[in-house]
Amino acid sequence: MKKLNVAVVGATGMVGRTFLKVLEEEKLPVENYYLFASARSAGSKVEFMGKEYIVEELNENSFDRGIDIALFSAGGSISEKFAPIAASKGCVVIDNSSAWRMVEECALIVPEINLDAFDNARKIVANPNCSTIQSVLPLKPLNDKFGLKRVVYTTYQAVSGSGQKGRDDLIRTLKGEEPEFYPYNISQT
C-alpha cells in the first residue's frame, strides 16, 4: 500500500488536536504529516507520533508538496478559501466545517452509512453536523429493516461545538464575567 502524505489544517485547535490523537491511534500508512494553522499559531511546536512538528502557516502554496489527504478543521471561511486550492492540486479534502455540506458537487459522507458515495474525482468531502452523524448511525439499520417514514429528533448542542472561544466564554460567564465571544451569557440559556 502506498504511504500517504497527510495534512491537518487547524492542527492547533480543539478539533485539529483530536484529529492528531486519532491519527496517532490509527497508525495509517503515512509518509509525511504536515500541520497547518493560522499565522498566530505558526511556529508553535506539537508533539505527535513521537516527533516534534513545527506548525506552518496555511497559505496558497501549502499544498504544493504532493499532499494526498487534508483534514480541515479551521472553520468555514478557511475551508471555503483553501479546500478548492488543495483539491486543484490533487488532494482529497475531508472538511469538518459546514462550508461544503450543502454543495451538491461535494460528497456528504458518514463512512459507516454511505462510504460508497465517495467519489475520488470530486476531491472535497464534507461531513454532516455531529448531531446528524450520531442520529443516522442507529437510524440506518432501523430504516433498512423497517423502512422509517418519519423521525422527530431534538438535540441540545454543546458549547464546545463553537471551539475554544465558546468554551472560554462558558467558563468566563460561569465565573460571573461578561461574555466575549457569544452575544449573551451562554451559561444562562
Annotated model-derived regions:
Residues M1-I186:
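N-terminal Rossmann-like NAD(P) cofactor-binding subdomain of oxidoreductases
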